[in-house]
Design a protein with these regions (language model features):
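Substrate-binding pocket helix/loop in short-chain dehydrogenase/reductase
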Residues: 99-100, 104-112, 203
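Alpha-helical segment proximal to the catalytic Tyr-Lys
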Residues: 128, 171-172, 231
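A conserved structural motif in NAD(P)-dependent oxidoreductases
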Residues: 207-218, 229
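Short, small/polar-rich loop/turn modules that mediate ligand/substrate recognition or access, typified
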Residues: 174, 179, 233-235
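Conserved glycine-rich cofactor-binding loop
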Residues: 8, 15-16
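Active-site helix of classical SDR
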Residues: 123, 158, 166
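Short C-terminal tail/terminal secondary-structure segment
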Residues: 146, 223, 234-246
């Protein structure tokens, strides 16, 4: 029996990059998986198809992470489809790589709405279905610990908020057997932050391993936190950053 057999997971922003890798890994470990996507239905469908081809169960739900009601609705649709919710992975996120002085408040609002408000909304809705036991997993960022490159001020602020939300919530729901943890990736090779992109050189330079990470390396840590082996870990901020914060 796989370690997540009979479990149900919801991965927000699961149509590409880190989110898609997480969804596929949780499905490979036995979970039925729902993913949300904002606009790209074809990418979301491709993730669902890949999971089903490997014998898993999956569904894609359209929900802009900046829309609180849509995010809450995605949680309810997940439960309606699979009958329960055991694991929530708050992966949806965005960044605007500009200096703080050049960033508009509309741009900052978008980052806050997705990275913070969307995370709060999904978590609050999910907790209603986790009366006893469950896993809440945030996908934060290594810049929530330490900012080593310029141009990420609003993003870093939101990821710092996610870090403290994790620690505070872990205290509130621990008595119900629910764990809350924050996985903090460093530079990971995705379409939004490619290892050959304009921002790659300074990010790679501050890692101890002198390379970008892979999406499967993040997914592996998330799978561990979602599984039974991590049952005594909560309120933790777990970096997978190639030693960026070493």
């Amino acid at each position: 029996m796989s370690k997540l057999t009979e479990k149900v997971a919801l991965v927000t922003g699961g149509s590409r990059g880190i989110g898609a890798a997480i969804a596929k890994r949780l499905a490979a470990d036995g979970a039925s998986v729902a993913i949300t996507y904002a606009k790209d239905a074809s990418a979301a469908s491709a993730v669902v198809k890949a999971i089903k081809l490997d014998g898993g169960k999956a569904v894609a739900i359209q929900a802009d992470a900046a829309d609180v009601e849509a995010v809450k609705g995605a949680v309810e649709k997940t439960v309606a489809t699979f009958g329960r919710l055991d694991v929530l992975v708050n992966n949806a996120g965005t960044a605007i790589p500009k200096t703080f002085e050049e960033t508009t408040f509309d741009e900052m609002d978008r980052v806050i709405d997705i990275n913070v408000r969307g995370t709060l909304a999904a978590t609050q809705a999910a907790l209603k279905h986790m009366k006893s036991g469950g896993r809440i997993i945030m996908i934060g960022s290594s810049v929530g610990e330490r900012v080593l490159v310029p141009g990420l001020v609003p993003y870093a602020a939101t990821k710092g908020a996610v870090k403290m939300f994790t620690q505070g919530l872990a205290r509130e729901v621990g008595g119900r057997g629910i764990t809350v943890n924050n996985v903090q990736p460093g530079p990971i090779d995705t379409d939004l932050n490619p290892a050959a992109g304009d921002w790659a050189v300074p990010q790679k330079a501050v890692t101890a391993l002198d390379r970008y990470g892979r999406v499967d390396e993040v997914a592996a840590l998330v799978a561990f936190v979602a599984g039974p082996e991590s049952s005594y870990i909560t309120g933790a901020n777990l970096t997978v950053d190639g030693g960026m914060n070493a």
